[in-house]
Amino acid sequence: CQNCHMPQVEDPVKIAVGYTALLGRSPFNLHTFAGANSFMVDLIRRNKDALNIIASEANFDSTLAATNRNLRYNTLNAELSDPDFFNDSVGFELMLTNKSGHKFPSGYPSRRAIVVFTLTAENGDTLFSSGNFDSSGEIVNYGGVVEPHHDVITSENQVQIYEMNMGDVNGDFTTILERASVHLKDNRIPPLGFTNQHASYDTMRVVGAADTDSDFNKAGSTQGTGRDIVHYRIALNGYTGTFKATAKVYYQAVPPAWLTEMRTLDAPEINSFLSMYDEAPNIPALVAGDSLSELINPLHIQSLKIKSPVFYPNPTRASAGFNMQFQLKPEKIRVYSLSGQEMPLSWKKNSDGTWHINLSAAAGTYLVSVEVAGKRFTQRILLIPD
């Protein structure tokens, strides 16, 4: 727990005073605890006078900063696969890996993690969107009931929400702890090594469709991967241009729908809290994300007037590498000597949308081959001595 939730120093620290012979211990965890509920910390900060809280603004700011760092860097990893195209549709796999030592999200059952997946056209128009929030912090088109776990998402009305939902004695959804009797859903992502063979599994079961999802905490017949893979299958509806795919995972501590039952009750404490809640910005916290840009359906590549790539500077010094301007994301870049030998290289995208190519080669003339969607473009480039 300390490794993630408390900052660590490697220098030896004496853990008591008045003992000159006491040896320092290393590593030492500082007495600063970072959880995940930045929303409630901020709500208390905004109402600290009414709540008679004496902590300073600086204390709140440092706690919020530590909490947000913990969420962003110690919680989850998101990796979006290269697309698969099926006629007029596209498929992606989003792999989410739990980096913590417990289920994510964990703690009080109001907490949830939402996947926001978006396809955006080259002109900025939205081609597909699942999981977006409105100004109140609620998911668009969310009905306030149990959203099933999804292995495959094909519609904007399907949203992947990782959460634990409670049911009362009648099996109806409830947010009141005293009425909770059964689990209706628990697809929170387990930690690495979690299996259903543990002696305490009955108290922390995977419940609902996630239990039969073939890649939820599984790789074939092996359990304990600590990850889930969400499959997106999206119709392009005849769109022929380039597009961008973006996946982001957000954490939300107190969703608006969680307070629906509370709003039917009347008590000074409840009314005070609801007033504070309604005035606080309920902005979910970004936990992880990934994106792919300049994607295009190979079936539509012929409809584009693709210009040959432009390499510059040309000539260029052998140690400096060179840049490439090209309207699509290249699938392969290869460089050959005039004798046909393939040369080692690396390439990355520049901030201005061009590509930089580093080449391990002596001075001379080389052929640069760029491939995208079955097309190949070849040009010469001259490397001069440094």
Predicted features and spans:
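A glycine-anchored, Pro-Gly-centered beta-turn/N-cap motif
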Residues: G241, G353, A362-T365
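Short coil/turn motif common to extracellular beta-sandwich-like domains
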Residues: N87-G91, N314-G321
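Short proline/glycine-enriched turn/loop motifs at strand-loop junctions of beta-rich domains
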Residues: S110-R112, F326-E331
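Primarily the internal scaffold of c-type cytochrome electron-transfer domains
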Residues: C1-S214, A219-T225, V230-N237, A245-I296
